[in-house]
Amino acid sequence: MASKLCRSRALASALRSAKPSPAIRCLATTSRNLINMPEGPNPRQFPREPLPGALNAAVVNPADKYQSKADNLHKYGSWLMGCLPKYIQQFSVWKDELTIYISPAGVIPVFSFLKYNTAAEYTQVSDITAVDFPTKDQRFEVVYNLLSVRHNSRIRVKTYADEVSPVPSITPLYDGANWYEREVYDLFGVFFTGHPDLRRIMTDYGFDGHPLRKDFPMTGYTEIRYDEEKKRIVTEPLEMTQAFRNFEGGSSAWEQVGAGIDRKPESFKLPTPKPETKPEEKK
């Protein structure tokens, strides 16, 4: 038995030292090394045919980029107004964005139509926010952004409110609107009737005011700090004062930084008037 084992080991060592045959080599190397590829020109280096014309001009005119979409959105907005003439006041199209304007009384009917109608199916609410216009009677503009996954379409719905008039909640229709409406209430003070849990979501407990209102002072009303003597967090009124901000007459609430850029077209710019020359008195 031992002699047979020694013979097999000697045979294996002899095979390893000898030059491998082509049959053995094909098992140890890839097939690419055994195939003789013809040497020819590289197809990637072939000369390319010249283009028929120079591509200096834009392929799509920026003015016509959204023309086809805008036409379809105008038709869709007109169709929505025809379906809900009692609630939709107007609509606007800017580029590829459709916006409809409704009254607070039409929130539930319009959103029910936009969600369940087969030509709309806006089943997802992407965002709810608000904008504060202090000079308007209805100072808050509540903005809803909806998404239709089935039709790959978006729509924006706007309504209005003030400090005391509420807006119906769409939480019974869209579960995702729960926290969005709480955020709008917390930061702007807009009330939503029918909301299951309308309370603050971002500011602290007992916070005074609504931070995103234009008349809210930048310094706030109170200061929260840790008192070393009392060994706890205390809330104290601020002694810092802020200059009165007037929103009348179209003036901005914020100071401009720098000279800015005048984007008015040249056709609307009036030439600088020349100073009047007084006629010389005759002597």
UniProtKB/Swiss-Prot annotation:
Keywords annotated in UniProt: Electron transport, Membrane, Mitochondrion, Mitochondrion inner membrane, NAD, Oxidoreductase, Respiratory chain, Transit peptide, Translocase, Transport, Ubiquinone
Species for this entry: Neurospora crassa (strain ATCC 24698 / 74-OR23-1A / CBS 708.71 / DSM 1257 / FGSC 987)
* Top-level taxon of the source organism: Eukaryota
Region Disordered: start and end of each range? 258-283
| Principal cellular location given in the protein's record | mitochondrion
As for family, the record states: Belongs to the complex I 30 kDa subunit family.
List the subcellular locations. Answer: Mitochondrion inner membrane
Keyword Transcription regulation among record annotations: no
Catalytic activity, reaction form: a ubiquinone + NADH + 5 H(+)(in) = a ubiquinol + NAD(+) + 4 H(+)(out)
Q: Which proteins does it associate with, and in what oligomeric form? A: Complex I is composed of about 40 different subunits. This is a component of the iron-sulfur protein fraction.
Instruction: Name the Pfam families for this protein.
Output: Complex1_30kDa (PF00329)
Coiled-coil positions: none
Q: Name one GO molecular function term.
A: NADH dehydrogenase (ubiquinone) activity
What's its EC?
Answer: 7.1.1.2
Instruction: Give TM regions.
Output: none
Q: By what name is this protein known? A: NADH-ubiquinone oxidoreductase 30.4 kDa subunit, mitochondrial
Q: Which HAMAP family match?
A: NDH1_NuoC
- The first-level EC class reads translocase
Does the keyword NADP feature in the UniProt annotation?
no
Q: Which PANTHER family match?
A: NADH DEHYDROGENASE [UBIQUINONE] IRON-SULFUR PROTEIN 3, MITOCHONDRIAL, NADH DEHYDROGENASE UBIQUINONE IRON-SULFUR PROTEIN 3
Q: What does this protein do?
A: Core subunit of the mitochondrial membrane respiratory chain NADH dehydrogenase (Complex I) that is believed to belong to the minimal assembly required for catalysis. Complex I functions in the transfer of electrons from NADH to the respiratory chain. The immediate electron acceptor for the enzyme is believed to be ubiquinone.
